[in-house]
């Protein structure tokens, strides 16, 4: 079974400027815009906003 293009792999980059990133999958039908999640950034030591990069 092939991977669906409906759920592509995206990279989330930290907005704190540390260069940290997470890799996740998203559903294009439910989230057509760029994904933004608050996740833990170990370089800063707290939760910050991570945005999808292309």
Curated annotation (Swiss-Prot):
InterPro entries: Ribosomal_bL33 (IPR001705), Ribosomal_bL33_CS (IPR018264), Ribosomal_bL33_sf (IPR038584), Ribosomal_zn-bd (IPR011332). GO terms for molecular function: structural constituent of ribosome. Pfam families: Ribosomal_L33. GO terms for biological process: translation. The keyword Ribosomal protein applies. Keywords: Ribonucleoprotein, Ribosomal protein. PROSITE patterns: RIBOSOMAL_L33. Gene3D superfamilies: Ribosomal protein L33. GO terms for cellular component: cytosolic large ribosomal subunit. Belongs to the bacterial ribosomal protein bL33 family. PANTHER family: 54S RIBOSOMAL PROTEIN L39, MITOCHONDRIAL, LARGE RIBOSOMAL SUBUNIT PROTEIN BL33M. HAMAP family: Ribosomal_bL33 (MF_00294). This is Large ribosomal subunit protein bL33C. It comes from Streptomyces griseus subsp. griseus (strain JCM 4626 / CBS 651.72 / NBRC 13350 / KCC S-0626 / ISP 5235). The gene is rpmG3.
């Amino acid at each position: 079974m092939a991977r669906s293009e409906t759920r592509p792999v995206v990279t989330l980059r930290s907005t704190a400027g540390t260069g940290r990133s997470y890799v996740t999958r998203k559903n294009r039908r439910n989230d057509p815009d760029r994904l933004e999640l608050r996740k833990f950034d170990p370089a800063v030591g707290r939760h910050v906003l991570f945005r999808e990069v292309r």
